[in-house]
């Protein structure tokens, strides 16, 4: 896949997935954190594995519960990982539903 979607949530929780948005369920959301070993590592691994790394795109979707610092942090990761193709967009309803379901689970220890 040439894309990764990142969902920024409440309490600094961060999720990512790589599939068609219409098919996303809570079980598809992989939890990580804002560290170098967290989301940065995931972005780098997915970019290397992409069909065309020059077209690799990060789709950033902050929830209403995400804070401004998290947005700054994820934009910093775009710079650090050299991702020039990224977009900040709203969540679709099925992503909101998957996120709310996932938030019922304890925070992952990364």
Task: Label the predicted regions.
Residues 1-110:
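Long, low-hydrophobicity, acidic/polar, solvent-exposed interaction domains
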């Amino acid at each position: 896949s040439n894309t990764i979607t990142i969902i920024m949530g409440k309490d600094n929780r961060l999720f990512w997935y790589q599939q068609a948005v219409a098919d996303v369920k809570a079980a598809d959301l992989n939890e990580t954190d804002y560290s170098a070993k967290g989301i940065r590592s995931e972005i780098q691994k997915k970019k290397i594995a992409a069909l065309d790394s020059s077209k690799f795109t990060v789709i950033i979707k902050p929830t209403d519960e995400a804070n401004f610092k998290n947005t700054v942090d994820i934009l910093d990761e775009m710079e650090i990982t050299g991702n020039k193709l990224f977009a900040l967009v709203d969540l679709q309803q099925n992503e909101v539903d998957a996120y709310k379901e996932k938030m019922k689970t304890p925070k992952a220890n990364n």
